[in-house]
Amino acid sequence: MELKIARAIIKHGLEDLYEYSDVDVAIVGAGPAGLTAARYLAERGHKVVVYERRFSFGGGIGPGGNMIPKIVVQEEAVPVLRDFKIRYKPVGDGLYTVDPAELIAKLAAGAIDAGAKIILGVHVDDVIFRGDPPRVVGLLWVWTPIQMSGSHVDPLYTQAKAVLDATGHDAEVISIAARKVPELGIEVRGEKSAWAEVSEKLVVEHTGRVAPGLYVAGMAVCTVHGLPRMGPIFGGMLLSGRRAAEIIHKDLVEEVYAVRA
């Protein structure tokens, strides 16, 4: 029995890693923006992998507002909630409350059911780039416990037509690319203090491509573009993820037509 368990895990786990070493879109971060983008991209037929450094979904959703188990979503994001069949309650002024556990579970299930592959416990260590001018064409990664231990272990690669940084406040992938590939011309300006009403709009407007092959969504947008933070209102995160999916899909389709031409 034990041997069968071990071989089943090794065989099918390694098959998944092999299959998803070459994808259309690699998303880093399984928070609200990353999971939303994954669902909308996967249902458009793109091969999507999501890497999450923790062994759980949701990013900053779980703690709610200062550990009170509710978060807020504004009117504009209600269509996204409906797409994922997430329940919400009106509180007035175009705002709604949502249960954090339900939001996490249904965002993740929606992405998985659409065809995205989510791999937990992955630390993205670097990007792959090609060309002059350069383009991001993939990622380097190790398992999170290896990174946390400080052990010197060479990472493995994932090839991707598009990489989406949805890592939250730290904008980890874009910060690495900005530092190590200065020819990409990326400036990480740093997140500002809170102004929720303004930032909820700006985070969606500034979602998109920051360099060839490299995109940003969610709180990482605030860090890259120097926007205010917003706290436990998550509509902007959902809308940012949806917009990132729309932009990436458009770019990938245009690239296919350009190659055929």
Curated annotation (Swiss-Prot):
Catalytic class of the enzyme: transferase
Binding site for NAD(+): A33, E52, R53, G60, V124, H152, V153, D154, M219
Cofactor dependence: Fe(2+)
HAMAP family (UniProt xref): Thi4
GO molecular function annotation: iron ion binding; pentosyltransferase activity
Positions annotated to bind Fe cation: D154, H169
Protein's recorded name: Thiamine thiazole synthase
Keywords: Iron, Metal-binding, NAD, Thiamine biosynthesis, Transferase
Subunit note: Homooctamer; tetramer of dimers.
Pathway(s) it belongs to: Cofactor biosynthesis; thiamine diphosphate biosynthesis
Binding-site positions, glycine: R229
Family annotation (InterPro entries): FAD/NAD-bd_sf, Thi4_fam, Thi4_prok
